């Protein structure tokens, strides 16, 4: 799925400010940096995943532009602004547990995004995004095996490309 997602995003991410919510081992984070992202905020709250994320960063020489956050997206996203791209791969259980956490992620990501920024969020086949996020509009959704990825953008975006 990672390769398909980067084919969708474009091969180069030169200078972009990217946020990787629920970064896990950092696969998306490090791929984005290798494709020229100027800054990637990798957010990972999991006590077992954070050491793996740090070890992977060290193996890669702690790449320039990498900012690791051993914290929840609720703690980090409110401090970020003018983000070009947010990638969120929350645990699928978040969709099954009433989706309140997903709704909060959408709300905070909408505030962090630049006017032309994009949010890519992954979900489990059969699950859906919660309604009631008036600041984001779903532009496209693609299926990848047992999951999907949706592209959302701010409703008030300033470009005219749609």
Residue ranges and their predicted role:
Residues 1-162:
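Class I S-adenosyl-L-methionine-dependent methyltransferase catalytic core
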């Amino acid at each position: 799925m990672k390769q398909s997602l980067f084919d969708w995003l474009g091969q180069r991410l030169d200078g972009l400010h990217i946020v990787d919510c629920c970064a896990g081992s950092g696969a998306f984070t490090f791929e984005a940096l290798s494709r020229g992202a100027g800054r990637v905020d990798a957010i990972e709250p999991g006590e077992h995943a954070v050491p793996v994320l740090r070890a992977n960063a060290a193996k890669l020489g702690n790449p320039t532009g990498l900012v690791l956050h051993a914290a929840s997206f609720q703690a980090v996203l409110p401090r970020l602004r003018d983000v070009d791209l947010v990638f969120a791969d929350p645990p699928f259980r978040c969709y099954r547990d009433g989706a309140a956490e997903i709704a909060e992620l959408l709300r905070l990501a909408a505030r962090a995004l630049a006017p032309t920024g994009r949010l890519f969020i992954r979900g489990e086949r059969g699950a859906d995004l919660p309604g009631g996020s008036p600041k984001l509009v779903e532009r496209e959704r693609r299926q990848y095996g047992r999951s999907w990825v949706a592209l959302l953008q701010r409703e008030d975006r300033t470009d005219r490309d749609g």
